[in-house]
Amino acid sequence: MTRVKRGNVARKHRNKILNLAKGFRGAHSVLFRTANQQIIKSLRYAYRDRARKKRDFRKLWIARINAASRQNNISYSQLINQLKTSNILLNRKILAQIALLDGPVFSQIVMESNS
């Protein structure tokens, strides 16, 4: 088998990894091996946290709706149940935005769901 000189290919590969590791702390942005390990770890974190972000936002929306609904003397679960039974099709994201930015409109929605 003939010898393959990988000078350019290996350097290009290492530079690609080191460019991805820009902004990392300490040796993680300078040394190839630690940078490579950190890149793998950071990609894993990014994948995991893309799913976690959806959970966290849903939790935040529910907390905001719950706080606003309790100001209107109704619990979150009762409000959601009444919205479903009265066929008011507002998702949690929109309800949370209304509760945060426009309290009187949220109170009207609660009143509509009661009737």
UniProtKB/Swiss-Prot annotation:
Q: Which SUPFAM superfamilies does the UniProt entry name for this protein?
A: Ribosomal protein L20
Name the InterPro entries on file: Ribosomal_bL20 (IPR005813), RIBOSOMAL_L20_CS (IPR049946), Ribosomal_protein_bL20_C (IPR035566)
Give the main location: plastid
Query: Which Gene Ontology CC terms are recorded?
Result: chloroplast; ribonucleoprotein complex; ribosome
Output the Gene Ontology terms for molecular function.
rRNA binding; structural constituent of ribosome
Question: Is RNA-binding set as a keyword in this record?
Answer: yes
- Per its UniProt record, what HAMAP family does this chain match? Ribosomal_bL20
NCBIfam families referenced in this protein's UniProt entry, alphabetically:
rplT_bact
Write the protein's name: Large ribosomal subunit protein bL20c
Query: Per UniProt, what is the name of the gene that codes for the protein in this document?
Result: rpl20
